[in-house]
Amino acid sequence: MNNMIELRARNAILGAMVGDSLGSTFEFTKQKQAANKLAQYNYLSDGLIGKGPFGLKPGQFTDDTEIALAIMSVIHEYGYYDQYRVAEKYHEWYNSNPFDIGNTTKNSLSQNSCSDMIKASRKYNFGSMSNGSLMRLFGLVPMFYDRVPSSRTTKFIMKAIQQDIILTHSNPEMGPIAIIYGLMLWHAIQGHNASNVYKYGKLLAEKYHSDLYLSIYLSVDSEYDFFDYNDTRYHLNQIDSSNFGFVGFSIWLMLRSLKKHSDYRNAIIEIVSHGGDTDTNACITGALFGALYYNTIPSVWIDSVLNCQATERYQNYPIANPKIWSQWLP
């Protein structure tokens, strides 16, 4: 096994966690407020500070990262993605009194069985295109870093992603959307550069007929400050709007970052400066940039996550403790 692949997988996970934790400080802010806070906190040069709307500890992460840990725990123990065991872990998380939970997630994970989660997703979440479904994939894709690249491996990862997505999202577009992101992440972990990952994503978007991705690729390639999807035009200055959880914004920021940045820190700071769903947006791009630019994640940010002391939360959800989940890292 190539040690660099293992390093990229490890830093994809850490990059996601750092992005989530950093972004949580600015969650739900407007663009101007986010920019002012970044300057006030000296762009987190001394480490992550927590706080935010939920009063988090420095280095503490949010709900979807905790959910990603549920996936990691199953893959670590069994070596593969087991939908039934993951569903059990998801429900355990739901019962842990999380400090935040989105409506889409609550609708499904409040059910106590895999089949009931899928039924609830079909009943209540058909219209949801929320971004947490992509965010938690950093707990899945990097865990298979040591699989030999092949069409069989691609199908294996695609199946796992699809099985995970349907636990919370039943919109038929969300499966391909998640698969495209997941395969881009795996591609980066295997050592492909940002340009190749960007082009690979576009090929996947064409292959799986993802109108959302194709529209966003057109926007990024043309350097527009908007993209069109389902007869609606989305503008860059709407990222902090009431529709901030739309997965399209997360994908847009990710693809813009791939074209613009070659450094983890700069990409994450710019994403957060837009305000809105800063934790999720930074996490989704953070995983990809952690794999691509693994040596550019500020060590002080990684240390903040690895040394987090959210002891009260660990009592209800023990696997959020770095002493536990750090043992599962590649």
UniProtKB/Swiss-Prot annotation:
UniProt xrefs under InterPro entries: ADP-ribosylglycohydrolase (IPR050792), Ribosyl_crysJ1 (IPR005502), Ribosyl_crysJ1_sf (IPR036705)
Molecular function (GO) terms for this protein are: hydrolase activity
Q: Which UniProt keywords apply?
A: Hydrolase
Q: What class of enzyme is it?
A: hydrolase
Q: What is its EC number?
A: 3.2.2.-
User: What SUPFAM superfamilies would the database entry show?
Assistant: ADP-ribosylglycohydrolase
**Family statement drawn from the similarity comment of this UniProt entry:** Belongs to the ADP-ribosylglycohydrolase family.
What protein name applies here? Answer: Putative ADP-ribosyl glycohydrolase L543
User: In the record, what lineage is assigned to the organism producing the protein?
Assistant: Viruses, Varidnaviria, Bamfordvirae, Nucleocytoviricota, Megaviricetes
